[in-house]
């Protein structure tokens, strides 16, 4: 199986909230460097995606602003693809895992009705991400998997 984070997206992100998510993600990217160097980074009006730099890479994390269509990969992994989109990212707890957790925390904080998350990890695994998000983004997030 492996160490994996999961999320469900129920709708597209509000434009202003997405812009805030991208801005926070850019700040977080700077904060995790150099311990977590990122590769193949896209933080745009349409998508946030990244991986670790080889050999500290695993699966690419991808979050789309718009609701992905039902025919996307993983669409068959849930009962009703018209209701939500399921995705996951196996990080093997490599250094970029911290950034994956941070983006999921911020996304859920900004749009809790749009995205929910779950994890194979324990609360203690997520505490560094919670602390970093709260410090860098001036938010008050907590570990609250709700998927």
Name every feature range the model reports, one short phrase each.
Residues 1-147:
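Acidic (Asp/Glu-rich) sequence patches and key acidic residues
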């Amino acid at each position: 199986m492996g160490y994996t984070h999961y999320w469900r997206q129920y709708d597209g992100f509000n434009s202003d909230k997405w812009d805030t998510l991208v801005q926070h993600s850019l700040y977080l990217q700077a904060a995790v460097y150099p311990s977590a160097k990122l590769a193949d980074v896209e933080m745009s009006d349409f998508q946030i995606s990244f991986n670790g730099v080889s050999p500290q890479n695993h699966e690419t994390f991808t979050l789309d602003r718009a609701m992905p269509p039902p025919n996307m990969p993983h669409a068959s992994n849930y009962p009703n693809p018209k209701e939500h989109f399921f995705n996951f990212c196996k990080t093997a707890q490599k250094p970029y895992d911290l950034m994956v957790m941070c983006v999921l925390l911020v996304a859920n904080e900004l749009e809790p009705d749009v995205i929910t998350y779950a994890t194979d990890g324990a609360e203690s695994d997520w505490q560094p991400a919670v602390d970093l998000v709260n410090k860098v983004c001036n938010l008050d997030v907590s570990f609250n998997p709700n998927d």
